[in-house]
Structures are given as C-alpha cells and as structure tokens.
Amino acid sequence: MTIFFSVEILVLGIAEFAAIAMDAAQQGDTTTILMLPWLGYGHLSAFLELAKSLSRRNFHIYFCSTSVNLDAIKPKLPSSFSDSIQFVELHLPSSPEFPPHLHTTNGLPPTLMPALHQAFSMAAQHFESILQTLAPHLLIYDSLQPWAPRVASSLKIPAINFNTTGVFVISQGLHPIHYPHSKFPFSEFVLHNHWKAMYSTADGASTERTRKRGEAFLYCLHASCSVILINSFRELEGKYMDYLSVLLNKKVVPVGPLVYEPNQDGEDEGYSSIKNWLDKKEPSSTVFVSFGSEYFPSKEEMEEIAHGLEASEVNFIWVVRFPQGDNTSGIEDALPKGFLERAGERGMVVKGWAPQAKILKHWSTGGFVSHCGWNSVMESMMFGVPIIGVPMHVDQPFNAGLVEEAGVGVEAKRDPDGKIQRDEVAKLIKEVVVEKTREDVRKKAREMSEILRSKGEEKFDEMVAEISLLLKI
C-alpha cells in the first residue's frame, strides 16, 4: 500500500512554539532532557518509567511523541510529576488513509506498519524545530530514528541511545558484522529449528525492510555519546552487556527492569471485574495469556491456544486483540465453537485491552503465556511470574530462549511446519502452574523478583553519574 503524505502538517504553529519556548526559558539552571521513543507501547512505557526516575534526580524532562500516544500514557503519570515531566507533541504527516489516531503501533494493522515508519522519518523537520526551541542539554533517543541523533549533532546537543530491547539479541546481531568468520562466543544459546529456518528464508521485500531498519538501528547505536542505556539488568544479561561494550567501544549501562508499578486499588477501565474474578481463585492458580499490542494471532493459532488452555484445566485470563478498524471480528468467531461455554468460570476472555501489570502482580496469577516481547518479559520477572513462551516474530524467539536460559520460563516448541501445538501448550501450562516437574522454574522466578525488587532507585546511580560526566554538571 502506497500512502502519500502532505508535508504542510510539519509546520508548528506560532502559538505552540511560543508556549514551549516560554517553558524552556523558565527552566533556568535546571538540566533539561528531551526523550524521543519509538511509537510502540513497550518503548513508550519504558521511556516513561525512565523519565520518572530522571525527574526524581532533579532533571526536567520533555517527553516527545504523537498525540495518540501521549493521550494513552498520561493516565500512568501521577500528578506529582506534573512540574518535572512535560509532554511535547510530535506532528507526523498524515493523510486521509493515515489519520493521526493511527500514529501508534498499538492495534495498528500490520499492512500500515511501513507507512508508520515512513511518517515517523518524515517528522525529522518538525523534531528539529522542537530541539531548536527547547534547546535541551541532552537528547535520549530510541533505536529506530537515526535522524534524531543527526539533528541533535547539527545543533551541538549531546545524544544518548536508550535501547528498550534485550542485550543478547543486539550483541548476537552485531557479532557477524564485526567478526564475520567466527561464531558467536556464547554457543550455549541455540534458537529452535523453526526460527532458524524462518530468519533464513524471508522474502525479498521483508529482507530489504529488515536490512534498512537494521542499518538505522546500527547507526543509532554508534551515534550515541560514549554510553548506551539498556532496559535490562546484569543478573540476566551481564555477559552480553560486557560483549556489546566491546563490540561498540561504548559503556553499556543497565537501567532495567523499567516496569510500571501498579496500584491494585487504582482505577483502570475494566479492571474491577477482572480483579473480582481473580480474587475468587486460589493463589498462583491462574495463567495470564496475552500476545502484546502489535501481533494478532491467526484463527488457526487462536484455535490451538484455546484447545491448549482447555486441555490444561488451569484457570486463565486471555486478552484477545484485533487490529484497529476491524469491525468484523468478534471473540466468538475467533474461538472454537463452544469454547467459552465449556470454560465457564474457569476462564475469562477480555477483548482489546487489560491492565497487564496489575494482572501479573495479582496473587492468583501463577503463569504467563506470552509472546515474549521484551516489556512483557521484564514485567513478568519483576512480579515473579514464570513464562510459557509462545514467541511470534522479530526479537521474541531470542527473548524466549533467554528466558529459558535464565530458568524463569519455558518455550513451547512448534511442530516441524512451525505451527503452535495445542498439546505442547497444555503440557507446559500444567507443568509450570500446577505440577511439581517445574517447581524449579517457579522458584527461580520468585528469586529473580526478589533480586529486582531489592535494587530500588540505586540501579539508576550509574546512569546519573554518566550523564553528569557527559554534561559536566
């Protein structure tokens, strides 16, 4: 699909510029940081948690994203941050086929993802105007916008890359670029055969898109000022952090896990009914099922997962999502006939959205059937919930392997054709949530949670020291 954008929308209004400029002038001697995440929810969430931590250290934060994304994350920002974190709207070019409410990956139909990347890159001119107006002391940017550090460099503004993915997948991807004739030094990690085949047989168009995004990702890493921030922690990826530091000749500073800490009694749309249902279950007896905001399982995948849940005989909450604009799909049509009736009180199916962190933190949740998106992996580890990994694409197979290596979860193996197997899903759910065979996984997940919760705000000390050194403050 080809979408034509008008560049006129990139022009920032005089009134808006004046308001931002006045705010910048009022900051005086305060060190200001502009943060620019990619448009995916996992990226936004991690950046927002980092913004909170920086503001607690007396930095003033400008948080820049599209209006639809800013509206989505504002409820997660307590009023105590209203003076230290300011939202700044980034205008993407739009068109009748690509209006502003689609300027996010959340629920975006996969066919429109290339258009979103194109529109984001075309926002560079507007972003330059924002940088010129605010004149922040530092830019912290994500990994899919090489134009951001270029613009910052032209304005003599130092920039640091904050990577919201895991370190293993980055170091594994960079290794053949630096050492094309040698094996990755950590040979104990092996992808399942299905994923090896999938990554080696991508079609030409996918390969070209992947190549371009890989180049952008690589540029963002190398453009960072002597330091790379990573949403991870040494207990999980220490050896990969050390190796990435060697590959990039930059200091890799962990700041993770960056996880939204929910208040179980807080107001979230639809949570009261979920909480009431969870409260009736036994401790650690329920499995939470979700595949993130950007992947929509096929009907065949939905059926295999449903049959697996049914055969496991374990309580479950399953979040089912459909792309924006899909008004033809209903839960009943997507699931096997009679599934909801047979599940009865043992299962709850939620359409669209559910407060994942609150569900994972609830005492009756004992397992997480997850696509292994990095944000979900971090949340699961923070709350001590073991993972049953059902990765779908991009970095998720690598994350699932890392989860297995850490001992806090297991990956569901696919059949020789790469399809999800209902029997495998059922078996792993029972083992992880109920049976003694995976008690070691449950124990390791609890231990990991205790380690992470003991860190507190001290995990940001190294980051603050590096920023202070860079800015000479």
Curated annotation (Swiss-Prot):
Catalytic EC class: transferase
Protein family according to the UniProt entry: Belongs to the UDP-glycosyltransferase family.
Active-site feature positions: 43 (proton acceptor), 142 (charge relay)
EC number of the protein: 2.4.1.-
Residues that, per the record, bind UDP-alpha-D-glucose: 293, 356, 374-376, 379, 395-396
One Gene Ontology biological process: carbohydrate derivative biosynthetic process
Anything else known: Mogrosides, the major active constituents of S.grosvenorii fruits, are a mixture of cucurbitane-type triterpenoid glycosides that have been proven to be powerful and zero-caloric sweeteners and can hence be used as a sucrose substitute for diabetic and obese patients.
Name listed for the protein in its UniProt record: Mogroside IIIx synthase
GO molecular function: UDP-glycosyltransferase activity
Applications reported: C.sativus and L.esculentum expressing S.grosvenorii genes SgSQE1, SgCS, SgEPH2, SgP450, SgUGT269-1 and SgUGT289-3 accumulate siamenoside I and mogrosides III and V, thus providing a strategy for vegetable flavor improvement or for heterologous biosynthesis of mogrosides. S.cerevisiae missing EXG1 but transformed to express S.grosvenorii optimized UGT74AC1 (UGTMG1) and UGT94-289-3 (UGTMS1-M7) cultured with mogrol and glucose accumulates mogrosides I-E, II-E, III-A and IV-A as a result of mogrol multi-glycosylation.
Expression sites by tissue: Highly expressed in mature fruits.
Keywords, alphabetical: Transferase
Domain of life: Eukaryota
Catalytic reactions of this protein: mogroside IIE + UDP-alpha-D-glucose = mogroside IIIX + UDP + H(+); mogroside III + UDP-alpha-D-glucose = mogroside IV + UDP + H(+); mogroside III + UDP-alpha-D-glucose = siamenoside I + UDP + H(+); mogroside IIIX + UDP-alpha-D-glucose = mogroside IVA + UDP + H(+)
Biochemical pathway: Secondary metabolite biosynthesis; terpenoid biosynthesis
Positions in coiled-coil regions: none
Function summary: UDP-glycosyltransferase involved in the biosynthesis of cucurbitacin and mogroside tetracyclic triterpene natural products (e.g. siamenoside I and mogrosides IV, V and VI). Cucurbitacins have cytotoxic properties and exhibit deterrent taste as a defense barrier against herbivores. Mogrosides are nonsugar highly oxygenated compounds used as high-intensity zero-calorie sweeteners; they also possess pharmacological properties such as regulating immunity, lowering blood sugar and lipid levels, protecting the liver, and acting as antioxidants and antitumor agents.
